[in-house]
Swiss-Prot record:
Catalytic machinery residues: K40 (proton acceptor), Y263 (proton acceptor)
Source organism phylogeny: Bacteria, Bacillati, Bacillota, Bacilli, Lactobacillales
The species this protein was found in: Lactococcus lactis subsp. cremoris (strain SK11)
EC numbers, comma separated: 5.1.1.1
Function, as annotated: Catalyzes the interconversion of L-alanine and D-alanine. May also act on other amino acids.
Protein name per the record: Alanine racemase
Positions annotated to bind substrate: R136, M310
Length: 367
């Protein structure tokens, strides 16, 4: 899918806000730690290449989800270290080694397959993944970790790091977080040798668990100005949302009482009503669940009426407006604001998902 440059729906990304958020984190966390931002999933919908280039001087490296995301950054001349957080197929490790991309080693079985490849492994860097309670990828005992270190040393693979990921660092109840912390620390204490990087701090841990002293802080959603807990925990300092979502009115009409709007005729007017059409729909990541939610027109809340279509949706206006009038879906307009978390709460999901679902059809504009 290609971006639609001629379509009047845009995500406005404030790169200065992202830089400012990182600067605030640098004052909050361990001063000796390096920040490695998570720019996976196209930097949570903000644009991985643009974000990476904008903050490169502030960070030690970057974290991505898969090898293709890492290759994209290298192809756009991002030279800082890159760590792939998910496992990759062993057949592709030579690509990572050639491009100086560090890989997650999720298991001894995976590493055994890697060393069977006819590849030059001396340039390969690995971070052993530890499953301390997330249940996703990673080893669960120190014996397997030490066998992996021994195998890496035998084949001259650079055992660069070891890490885990906390499942509940953004929750008020710290019981499971502390259990994971204890499991990870136990494995660290039993390692045959320590790597350069030991890291477990994600955004939530950096915000609310400063006792974590790490070489790397993996900064994610809050770099983009959002609270990882939604509205559960209060942020220790103010951050600025970096993305706003705007469109325009492309069609306006007055319809009589008793008329219906949208697929399924799910909305019926009770009086003469001004209806505006906005060029965004579920193919753009603005899902059908948004029926009944609000947008902002001239600083006023306007209801989304009828089912959201694939490419367009309809809103109830308080009066007639000129074609091209701005419609704010996420962001501030005059005295009112709609946040990404507001959208997430309406859908019954999290702010991460709202951003990541914004499709490539929505052009990104950087300031």
């Amino acid at each position: 899918m290609k971006t639609s440059p001629h379509r009047n729906t845009s995500a406005i990304v404030d790169l200065k806000a992202i830089r400012n958020n990182i600067e605030k984190f640098k004052k909050h966390i361990n001063p000796n730690a390096e920040i490695w931002p998570a720019v996976k999933a196209d930097a949570y919908g903000h644009g991985s290449v643009e974000v990476s280039k904008a903050v490169s001087d502030l960070v030690g490296g970057f974290c991505v989800s898969n090898l293709d995301e890492a290759i994209e950054l290298r192809n756009h001349l991002v030279t800082k270290p890159i760590l792939v957080l998910s496992g990759i197929v062993p057949e592709d490790v030579d690509i990572a080694a050639a491009l100086n991309i560090s890989l997650t080693a999720p298991s001894l079985e995976w590493l055994k397959l890697v060393v069977q490849e006819e590849a030059e492994l001396s340039d390969l860097k690995i971070h052993i993944g530890v499953d301390s309670g997330m249940g996703r990828i990673g080893i669960r005992d120190v014996e397997e970790a030490n066998q992996m270190i021994e195998l890496a040393d035998k084949y001259a693979i650079n055992f660069e790091g070891i890490f885990t990921h906390f499942a509940t660092a953004d929750m008020a109840d710290e019981t499971k977080f502390k259990n994971q912390q204890a499991r990870f620390n136990k494995i660290m204490a039993g390692l045959s040798r320590q790597p350069k990087f030991i890291h477990s701090t994600n955004t939530a841990a950096a915000l609310w668990h400063k006792e974590q002293v790490q070489a790397i802080e993996r900064l994610g959603i809050s770099m983009y100005g959002l609270n990882p807990s939604g509205k559960t925990l209060e942020l220790p300092f103010e951050i600025e949302p970096a993305l706003s979502l705007v469109s325009e009115l492309t069609h306006i009409k007055k319809i009589a009482a008793g008329e219906t709007v949208g697929y399924g005729a799910t909305y019926e007017t009770s009086e003469e009503t001004w209806i505006g059409t906005v060029p965004i729909g579920y193919a753009d990541g603005w899902t059908r669940q948004m029926q009944g939610f609000k947008v902002l027109v001239d600083g006023k809340f306007c209801e989304i009426v009828g089912r959201v279509c694939m490419d367009q949706m309809m809103i109830k206006l308080d009066k007639s407006y000129p074609l091209g009038t701005k419609v704010t879906l996420i962001g501030r307009d005059k005295a009112n604001e709609i946040t990404t978390t507001d959208v997430a709460d309406w859908r019954g999901t999290i702010n991460y998902e709202v951003l990541c679902l914004l499709s490539d059809r929505i052009k990104r504009i950087y300031k």
